[in-house]
């Protein structure tokens, strides 16, 4: 997992997300605490529980983006889910246990890639030998056994050199490759996921070990054979053990739309997608054992980060037991005009950079002046204030409308320079911003 300090994590998040320093600090400390815990003695390590986080803030202020960037920084098993996808046990819909099953599947894929990287050199050598066997079939004796000769060995070395230098890349060869596993989707009733996994595993095992001939270019054949040979060098049981250890000690679950599972008002009927889901999440967040197809996974030390807008419901509307399982509360602020201005220019691959790069593919140069960027930021902020506040996502809508004509005629304007200044922004967006009804539908 990542060994970055909280300051380094915040600095990395600052490259992509503007503002929200409090949320970044909380997430950075939580991530660093995962590393700190792993440095403790085994006895003490079992006692240190993660401090789960509840992020509160309106839509479009960076909650999901923080999670997305955190996933890349963490170098640990990470999954993002929407709370609205789940229902109470016994009803149609996903059960909360599938969160851990999906997290384990993703962790296995990540661990497999890491382990394959370690054996890639040996796998590449084995794949080279298989390609050379096809290009230069070894001479056979009368008894059908392969014979070695100095001439054959010398020729093989010449071909090996050509293969490594790419001279044989476009030559077509026929090789035996592993047959693709049988993909079987089984729709199972709630609570029967384990049986479904076993049946899927049974069908996949039926096709395991089968091979079929394929005609491929040497370059593509080598790539496929390297993956195949690397897979053979891995120990499946050891891989599963490492995966479960990584999930239990470093796993991070980000649950979005958490406010949507709050119970609103008094209702006498069953609330299967709200309070029932909260009660199902309780043991998961507190610590329980989930049965997955890779083995039993304990959730005691998995970090849970919940986030929601909480515009209608309040955090206090969550059941008290769940509130206690999310001790760290972080409030994300509404974005200002200055924030919008910074979002347009400061992050890596900012929106203005993206449009400039897209238009450059058709030899059209776009220049955003400081006044133009300020006008775009003000336009987005005004529309948010007058209609629905969707945060930074409004910038996408405003910019797309602003660039519509340039994008449409780009092929006819190769070599031209367009300057997006305050006057240009006012010409294209002024009337829309002033007319509230129009801005509701178009912006």
Swiss-Prot record:
<keyword id="KW-0346">Stress response</keyword>
<feature type="binding site">
    <location>
        <position position="393"/>
    </location>
    <ligand>
        <name>ATP</name>
    </ligand>
</feature>
<feature type="binding site">
    <location>
        <position position="321"/>
    </location>
    <ligand>
        <name>ATP</name>
    </ligand>
</feature>
<dbReference type="Pfam" id="PF07724">
    <property type="entry name" value="AAA_2"/>
</dbReference>
<dbReference type="InterPro" id="IPR003593">
    <property type="entry name" value="AAA+_ATPase"/>
</dbReference>
<comment type="subunit">
    <text>A double ring-shaped homohexamer of HslV is capped on each side by a ring-shaped HslU homohexamer. The assembly of the HslU/HslV complex is dependent on binding of ATP.</text>
</comment>
<keyword id="KW-0143">Chaperone</keyword>
<comment type="similarity">
    <text>Belongs to the ClpX chaperone family. HslU subfamily.</text>
</comment>
<dbReference type="InterPro" id="IPR019489">
    <property type="entry name" value="Clp_ATPase_C"/>
</dbReference>
<dbReference type="GO" id="GO:0005524">
    <property type="term" value="F:ATP binding"/>
</dbReference>
<dbReference type="GO" id="GO:0009376">
    <property type="term" value="C:HslUV protease complex"/>
</dbReference>
<dbReference type="InterPro" id="IPR027417">
    <property type="entry name" value="P-loop_NTPase"/>
</dbReference>
<dbReference type="InterPro" id="IPR050052">
    <property type="entry name" value="ATP-dep_Clp_protease_ClpX"/>
</dbReference>
<dbReference type="GO" id="GO:0051603">
    <property type="term" value="P:proteolysis involved in protein catabolic process"/>
</dbReference>
<comment type="function">
    <text>ATPase subunit of a proteasome-like degradation complex; this subunit has chaperone activity. The binding of ATP and its subsequent hydrolysis by HslU are essential for unfolding of protein substrates subsequently hydrolyzed by HslV. HslU recognizes the N-terminal part of its protein substrates and unfolds these before they are guided to HslV for hydrolysis.</text>
</comment>
<feature type="binding site">
    <location>
        <begin position="60"/>
        <end position="65"/>
    </location>
    <ligand>
        <name>ATP</name>
    </ligand>
</feature>
<dbReference type="GO" id="GO:0043335">
    <property type="term" value="P:protein unfolding"/>
</dbReference>
<keyword id="KW-0547">Nucleotide-binding</keyword>
<feature type="binding site">
    <location>
        <position position="18"/>
    </location>
    <ligand>
        <name>ATP</name>
    </ligand>
</feature>
<dbReference type="InterPro" id="IPR004491">
    <property type="entry name" value="HslU"/>
</dbReference>
<dbReference type="GO" id="GO:0036402">
    <property type="term" value="F:proteasome-activating activity"/>
</dbReference>
<dbReference type="Pfam" id="PF00004">
    <property type="entry name" value="AAA"/>
</dbReference>
<keyword id="KW-0963">Cytoplasm</keyword>
<dbReference type="InterPro" id="IPR003959">
    <property type="entry name" value="ATPase_AAA_core"/>
</dbReference>
<dbReference type="GO" id="GO:0016887">
    <property type="term" value="F:ATP hydrolysis activity"/>
</dbReference>
<dbReference type="GO" id="GO:0008233">
    <property type="term" value="F:peptidase activity"/>
</dbReference>
<keyword id="KW-0067">ATP-binding</keyword>
<protein>
    <recommendedName>
        <fullName>ATP-dependent protease ATPase subunit HslU</fullName>
    </recommendedName>
</protein>
<feature type="binding site">
    <location>
        <position position="256"/>
    </location>
    <ligand>
        <name>ATP</name>
    </ligand>
</feature>
